[in-house]
């Protein structure tokens, strides 16, 4: 008999059956691992200025990137239930290193520099855009990069171009719409639909998509559960 499986939040793969007396059939989960990702226990690990510096911890990396001021730090703070886990700034382009946050050696949350910010020197912009490229193409533990898209504004060409670049280079992708509370619902919905329509010209299959608000916490639990599910499945491959 295969052992029971408990996965807090969701139980998966209820396919195993066994026969007992009187020909009764009991359905058991397929495996035993208890998967709980306690995001509130996330801790800052280290900042890196090059991929060569990154210490391989063997934990799956869930990276976050987007245009400057898209709400990336606020999202990471909401995800970890901490006000200052990732440093927020009113000054766009503040994040210029790769910041790692470790969640009990189960998950690495990776805060990547924002792209598309013009008000820094050309040399500095090239340096941290090169850092982004190097990480996305070379990280052996990258599970997915979430591209954050501002739902309060119409589709931005730079977001679509970045997603297309990731698609060409087979970078595993997800999309997180942020700031869904900033405009009236109809306008927000129209912006997201327009973005997805524009994206469909480049992707036959749309990347996994989430809608969030760091202010109201809308969609945060859904994102946490999705990450938890991926970690659970990684343990049972």
Predicted regions located by residue number:
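Conserved G1/Walker A P-loop phosphate-binding module
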Residues: 28-117
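Canonical P-loop GTPase G-domain recognition
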Residues: 39-48, 183-237
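Conserved nucleotide-binding/hydrolysis micro-motifs of P-loop NTPases
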Residues: 94, 107, 114-117, 152-154, ...
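Conserved nucleotide-sensing/catalytic segment adjacent to the nucleotide-binding pocket
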Residues: 105-140
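Conserved C-terminal guanine-recognition region of P-loop GTPase G domains, centered on the G4
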Residues: 134-206
